[in-house]
Amino acid sequence: MTAPALLCEVHGERDDGTGRPSLYLTFDDGPHPFCTPEILDILAEHRVPATFFVIGEFLADQSKLIQRMIAEGHHEVANHTMTHPDLSDCEPRRVQRQILETNRAIKMASPGGGAAHPRAPYGIWTEEVLKASANAATHAVHWSVDPRDWSSPGADAIVNDVLQSVRPGAIVLLHDGCPPDEMQQGADHSLRHQTIMALSSIIPALHDRPLCIYTLRLLGSSEDPMDIA
């Protein structure tokens, strides 16, 4: 039996009339009460959408941020598990719970939404995680560009890494928060400062290429036919 596919890039043209190749900005580990609003502000300034892979445990306290993402009309809320465990260490039932409970939390915060594409914490995928994604009729989403912004390499390093690595169909990994077990008291305001600074330079540079930035919302939809690699 063939294992379910893992999406690292999106191939194929979007039928939006622009004729420009696509690119996908994604953010992991939020929503964060200070970092996520700043990232949303930058995206709004440049009229750019993004896909946010959220941690379910945060949603009860940060439901207004999820509602803002939805209200702005073009962002996607996706699934980064309930507590951000290494799923390769989890029994199959726990893997299912991590994904399904996060889907429920997302739907509670944004009623009317469908099942959310999952992304495995740390990018560690197992056959069980891929099966759980397929059973939920979603695509397991990885990435093709990772500037390791979580390690705070400097805003310029983040910008350079992204711009040197992107190509049409690329899925870019950035972070707007951090896992629950990595939260450091007193560091909230500066947590993703480098990512926020870098994003203000990355978006205009991508537009100059030119590349069109989209969400992953319509993957697999007849409205938006694409080939998945």
Swiss-Prot record:
Family under the similarity heading: Belongs to the polysaccharide deacetylase family.
Positions of a divalent metal cation binding: H80, H84
Record: active site: D28 (proton acceptor), H175 (proton donor)
Organism: Rhizobium leguminosarum bv. phaseoli
Keyword Thylakoid set for record: no
SUPFAM superfamilies membership: Glycoside hydrolase/deacetylase (SSF88713)
Stated name of the protein: Chitooligosaccharide deacetylase
UniProt keyword annotations, A-Z: Cytoplasm, Hydrolase, Metal-binding, Nodulation, Plasmid
Gene name for this UniProt entry: nodB
Compartments where found: Cytoplasm
Function: Is involved in generating a small heat-stable compound (Nod), an acylated oligomer of N-acetylglucosamine, that stimulates mitosis in various plant protoplasts.
EC number(s) on file: 3.5.1.-
One Pfam family linked to the record: Polysacc_deac_1
Residue ranges annotated for the NodB homology domain, each copy included: 21-214
Record GO terms (molecular function): hydrolase activity, acting on carbon-nitrogen (but not peptide) bonds; metal ion binding
Main location: cytoplasm
NCBIfam families xrefs: nodulat_NodB
An annotated GO cellular component: membrane
Marked site positions, Raises pKa of active site His: D149
GO biological process: carbohydrate metabolic process
